[in-house]
Amino acid sequence: MENQKNDNLNLLEAVVQNTGMGKNTLEQIVPMTDDVQFKAELLRQRNVYHQLNQEAHTAIEACGGTAQGQSAMAKLNTKMGISMKTLTDKSTRNLAEMLTQGSGMGVVDCVKAQKDYPNAAPGAKRLVQRLQEFQEDSRVKLEQFL
């Protein structure tokens, strides 16, 4: 039972960190584009990340835990990386490429988390699977802007 609780908390924390990264990245990138269709897609994705993040937070609290989220250093590293990659190129194509790569990394993180925490409850597993499917779908949608 304790093993399942730990796997639940760890898997849900992975969702919190993954969705936090997506949400924070999109909040930084949205103001960089004037492409109306691209911006609409980014806002849609940001809202889904926010929703999944809230669901994971709620589930962690229901398990008696407290979500940690991304560390300040991880947030800073991401922010600086985006700033460097967009310093000279804020084109829709470049932004879409960056986000496509990020979505791919998010999918890999979901797969790893599911393998690392096999004893998690079905609800936690469904949440990470929804996140993975969303990120796979997002990557395909972003490829339209390459």
Please name every model-derived segment.
Residues 1-146:
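Amphipathic alpha-helical hairpins
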